[in-house]
Amino acid sequence: MTRRALVSVSDKTGLVPFARRLAALGVELLSTGGTQKALAEAGVPVTGVGDYTQAPEILGGRVKTLHPRVHGGILYRRGLASDEADVKARDIPPIDLVVVNLYPFREAVAAGKPFETCVEEIDIGGPTMVRSAAKNSAHVGVVVDPADYDKVAAELEATRALSDATRFYLMKKAFAHTAAYDAAISEYLTARETPEAAPAHFPATLAAVYTKAYDLRYGENPHQAGAFYRAAREPEEPSVAFAQVLQGKELSYNNLLDLQAALAGVMEFDETACVVIKHNTPCGVSTGRTAGEAFARARECDPVSAFGGIVALNRPVDEATASELTSLFLECVIAPGYDAAARAALAVKKNLRLLEAPRLGAARATWRRRPEEGRELRSIPGGLLVMDRDLGSVRREDCKVMTKRAPTEQEWKDLLFAWKVVKHVKSNAIVFAKDDRTVAIGGGQTSRVESVKTAVMKAALDVRGSSVGSDAFFPFADGVEEIIKAGATAIIQPGGSMRDAEVIAAADKAGIAMVATGMRHFRH
């Protein structure tokens, strides 16, 4: 039977109705600080913990519930003779229900509060009570989520006690709650730079907090279950995770992956640009005078693959752009915004998933990345691979001309465009570019020469006079020879092959230009 509950919450959602239901059952309510005040003002009978323990709050409220009469009442094992003797000797009544959620530490961090303020929002007594109650879940219920208030109250009203199954459910939730709280603190402190020490690039212990945003219909395939988890803080750069879904069917696992690929690609450009993604790799990229023109030019690179694709634009969508978008079946579109006419035009495509990411319209120079946002995580059974995200880029002055002929001004422009795109194509990656757009893309092949052949074979546009980007060096001259045969006139690649001399000789023989970046962009 539940006779006594300790209630101390920062999130007061649903607090008063829940407390009234407990009080109506004859449950004695103990409380502290703001929670006690809220209950008293609502007319709910409540006893202050200080009165209960005969020990007032001290140290400005830092010590409220850290008392044997509180934790003895929570932790004692009912029916165990030695525990029964201890609590009887010390006059410690049982506490059967603990209702606690913790100081808003994450909210303070997200709001950019000073370090000292954030430290004061680190809860001590709350997690201690939650862990005590969860450890003793055989006898005590612990509620950390207001969403569980109705379930708990209804069960108590029906049986005056919580079932083993309910207490175990609450126990799991409680430990997840405190684990996430501690991980948030660790993550914040790990990333903090001080005059004495910079944050560890890869800390000895990696703590991260993700909360389930929603279940997915399935994972990559229908036989795989899936869910989407969101980080505690929204990044300052554009984010699929925090983008607003304006219309369309629910997002799938594959949609989210493809949207991220599209977003990453379009974020390479300050100019008005569009990226079309299919199966997590670009099938068309272009800049344009308008967003609509950029999409139309990107689509022309591979119109067959663009069907059913994912589109990212870095400028707001107007009615003219919406008209272009509705001319093709698309799964998703993400952009900084949509005007009213565009929304009306796109509404006819009821299944089209429309996402808005306002930060996508801001200048790239304004984006800031916290240390944890510069990392990429991949799980393997029993481990986690962690690396820096591939945010590398090159300028013209970073490149070394490898051939006798240097690129023309137009070739330089096309080469640097191809280099921005090729890092987002699955390796082995080849991109033909001309006039600020891709004209052919080949990727995902197990040999570089086959990626060249694939790009040329699939090309819907004329590749003659184009410039080519390669994500890694050419191990043999055959790939370059195929590029020459296709009519391209310049190549940008990392360089560094044992056979660079052969590769350069093939380029010189054909009179084409080749430059080396010294930077590889493998994408597995």
Curated annotation (Swiss-Prot):
The protein's annotated pathway: Purine metabolism; IMP biosynthesis via de novo pathway; 5-formamido-1-(5-phospho-D-ribosyl)imidazole-4-carboxamide from 5-amino-1-(5-phospho-D-ribosyl)imidazole-4-carboxamide (10-formyl THF route): step 1/1; Purine metabolism; IMP biosynthesis via de novo pathway; IMP from 5-formamido-1-(5-phospho-D-ribosyl)imidazole-4-carboxamide: step 1/1
E.C. number(s) listed in UniProt: 2.1.2.3, 3.5.4.10
Superkingdom of the source species: Bacteria
InterPro entries: AICAR_Tfase_dup_dom_sf (IPR024051), Cytidine_deaminase-like (IPR016193), MGS-like_dom (IPR011607), MGS-like_dom_sf (IPR036914), PurH-like (IPR002695)
GO cellular component terms listed in the entry, alphabetical order: cytosol
SMART domains named among the record's database cross-references: AICARFT_IMPCHas, MGS
Domain spans labelled MGS-like: 1-144
GO MF terms held by the record: IMP cyclohydrolase activity; phosphoribosylaminoimidazolecarboxamide formyltransferase activity
GO BP terms in the entry: 'de novo' IMP biosynthetic process
Pfam short name (any one): AICARFT_IMPCHas
Domain notes: The IMP cyclohydrolase activity resides in the N-terminal region.
Family: Belongs to the PurH family.
This protein's name: Bifunctional purine biosynthesis protein PurH
Protein source organism: Anaeromyxobacter dehalogenans (strain 2CP-C)
